Amino acid sequence: MIKKELPDEFGHFGPYGGMFVADTLVSALKQLEHAYTKYRNDQDFLSELHTELKDYVGRPNPLYHAVHLSKKIGGAQIYLKREDLNHTGAHKINNTIGQALLAKRMGKTRVIAETGAGQHGVATATVAAKFGFQCVVYMGSEDIKRQSSNVYRMKLLGAEVVPVTSGSKTLKDALNEALRDWVSHVDDTFYIIGTVAGPHPYPQMVRDFQAIIGVEARAQHMEKTGRLPDALVACVGGGSNAIGLFYPFLNDQSVMIYGVEAGGKGIETGEHSASLIAGKPGVLHGNRTYLLCDEYGQVKDTHSVSAGLDYPGVGPEHAYLKDTGRVIYKAINDSEALDAFRLLTHTEGIIPALESSHAVAYAIQLAKTMSKEQSIIVNLSGRGDKDMHTVAAIDGITI
């Protein structure tokens, strides 16, 4: 049985989580924790958040029965939670709206963020434009190449995009640079972390803002079918879209829960981003969790066709859910994700993000082992517009 009161007062999910940061950041994190504790149950704050999610983000978004996909596969009925229909095209805005409202109440004038696929950067730049914050987004130079359209969107929204050329030039390096910035500008700056990783209180706070996904999906599935789903499936990079769907179902033992990591070119090749499946516990970006690292504890380079899953760690709550066995973690490789990307597009007229395609791919495998009376909710965490250049290049087409 999952204890719903996690994390504890120190930000621990069992042996994971915590606040492993330089002394210079402790007071900023404590200030943030105090503000979040104050406002998370404040009716004015929650009312404003609800209004923004409804009128600006476009919630609730639908739970869509993918009839044609389900029929083609045979087996369980697949339902898609349509986070791709949110303003900005992914689940990321659920969290950035929440953190922006908190930053406003804390009197901050500047927001910073890290981004991989660019979706969190776009969602942060969007709320910065809306609420009048100065905005700086750190992005690995490798990801800037892969996600040029999102880079332009951020600049259009008024954000400064800073290329990060250290390390593997991807998400983990962008996170390092953002943390360095925050240390230097703690008085006026709010760091909007995009996933359920990082030091306490971020894993809890981001989970709480993303839990709207599961709250809605649960009610929508009950309304459509009169019962709970048999399984949930979501992709896991840092893990915020997944924990958002999973959290409201954790105590429902009849619901099987699957997190899907990026298997890249195959786990056996070492070129992947599956930290829960192939990693071991360690400390990265302020929290203890599962990491991909070598025998000397150095963080390994990761690979995925999807920039948003290309991260060597994972949120600490996922590490805890793996160890307790409540969530089962699987890997889907690049080619399987691309096949699912094409199949969903062809059968339903919905172009998913490559991240979400990993979840769709595993749901397809799972559905085949289940009966037609059973159902699976897949978190369609984002739309695939941002991935057109990547998929076209794989197909040998230049656009």
From Swiss-Prot:
Residues bearing the modification N6-(pyridoxal phosphate)lysine: K92
Record keywords: Amino-acid biosynthesis, Aromatic amino acid biosynthesis, Lyase, Pyridoxal phosphate, Tryptophan biosynthesis
PROSITE patterns xrefs: TRP_SYNTHASE_BETA
GO cellular component terms attached to this protein's record: cytoplasm
Reaction equations catalysed: (1S,2R)-1-C-(indol-3-yl)glycerol 3-phosphate + L-serine = D-glyceraldehyde 3-phosphate + L-tryptophan + H2O
Cofactor dependency: pyridoxal 5'-phosphate
Pfam families: PALP (PF00291)
EC annotation from Swiss-Prot or TrEMBL: 4.2.1.20
Single Gene Ontology MF annotation: tryptophan synthase activity
Pathways per UniProt: Amino-acid biosynthesis; L-tryptophan biosynthesis; L-tryptophan from chorismate: step 5/5
Complexes and interactors: Tetramer of two alpha and two beta chains.
NCBIfam families listed in its UniProt record: trpB
Role according to the record: The beta subunit is responsible for the synthesis of L-tryptophan from indole and L-serine.
Family: Belongs to the TrpB family.
PANTHER family, A to Z: TRYPTOPHAN SYNTHASE, TRYPTOPHAN SYNTHASE-RELATED
Protein name: Tryptophan synthase beta chain
Source organism (scientific name): Legionella pneumophila (strain Corby)
Phylogenetic placement of the source organism: Bacteria, Pseudomonadati, Pseudomonadota, Gammaproteobacteria, Legionellales
Underlying gene: trpB
